[in-house]
């Protein structure tokens, strides 16, 4: 299994949050809250970097 070191957490129009690889068209996971999305991304990439897109459109980096 390939391990990735970078994931993006972004809000969806319906209010849920998605966890995606950079440049991916489809989400790796969809969850109800930003907190859950960050936890999921951390499970996918324990030592990786997570970029969280905030509701204002700016990104913040975790890890």
PLM region spans:
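Absolute protein N-terminus
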Residues: 1-2, 63
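Amphipathic, Lys/Arg-enriched alpha-helical "gate/interface" segment within cytosolic domains
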Residues: 2-4, 40, 53-54
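Short aromatic-glycine-(Arg/Gly/Cys) micro-motifs in beta-strand/loop hairpins
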Residues: 2-26
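Generic recognition of well-ordered secondary-structure surfaces with a strong bias
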Residues: 19, 37, 50-52
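Short amphipathic beta-strand/extended segments with alternating polar/hydrophobic composition
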Residues: 27-35, 60-63
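A short, charged, amphipathic alpha-helix used as a generic interaction element across diverse proteins
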Residues: 31-47
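Short, mixed-charge low-complexity intrinsically disordered segments
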Residues: 47-63
